[in-house]
């Protein structure tokens, strides 16, 4: 019995120990294990849910991929069809362009070939024609016949509407033209009955005054300034030039300064013009007008052919005395030169103010002819004209221009035949050389 009780107590102690310490520990461990299992189950459920969602998303992604792939395929097919159509259209357009360019190129090559053939044949034709013409005009009689034919053509021309002017009036405005006319009128009254020495004095003195005004620009400005009352300018002229100029020159200078000039330089132009008229009037008194006219034209043609000489004579950077010295050397080398011509040329060179020397001498020659009431016709021919041809040409030109015409002939074999005529600003070109040149110019490039 005691054994049983001892065992029962031992069992009770064991149960107490188990319940006191072991059971809570086991219970805690079991709860933890249950929590772990529960968490594992929840995680498993969540994982299953996520897996299901992933499967759904995968399925949807696959469907979307299929749909997008189909869309891309459709778009690619459409792009392919569009590109194919565009390439076909571009190919057609390019083919048409190439075809058109090819046709244009063929046409261009055809035209170039035709032009080359025409140019070659045309040049050969012109050269052959020139050879034939040169052979023809080598005969003086045949060359003269070309002049006669041109005179027949010229005879049929209508009268020219050109107004021929010469000398200083060419570059003047209306006011200065009227002023110059008054001054020339005064000169004519002074020159009427004057002898050669008086005219020479007037020419020298007026030329000297012009040179003074060129160097004294302030004085020139004052004397040329337009005023309603010229009394002050007249008194100034008397105070400066009385006793230094002859009575005729002084009266002419007073008349000049009393006029209204368009510009200051026109007063000098007018004095130079009247000084020239005085020398030309002297030539008339001495019966040398035609000789003076002829020598002036010859010197003008010399300057035309010697451009360097013309530039040297007109170079205002060179002192005037040096240019006059050069002129005298040229005049002396030309042989016997009329004294009036030498004086006119010297006066012209001394008063050059920027214009070319050849143009100034040409104006001087035209003034010499205009002084005799004639127009000047500068005629270029391949050979000298016969007296009959010269007379007929003079008659025809006088009838065309309605005024007596003086013919100045220049012989140039390069003209070949016919005539080249210049009257004032009008040119009548009937030379064979110009016709050949026109034919050569008209050839295609």
From Swiss-Prot:
GO terms for cellular component: plasma membrane; proton-transporting ATP synthase complex. It holds the Pfam family OSCP. This is ATP synthase subunit b-delta. In the N-terminal section; belongs to the ATPase B chain family. It is a single-pass membrane protein. Residues 50-79 are annotated as: Disordered. Its main location: membrane. The chain crosses the membrane at residues 4-24. It comes from Mycolicibacterium gilvum (strain PYR-GCK) (Mycobacterium gilvum (strain PYR-GCK)).
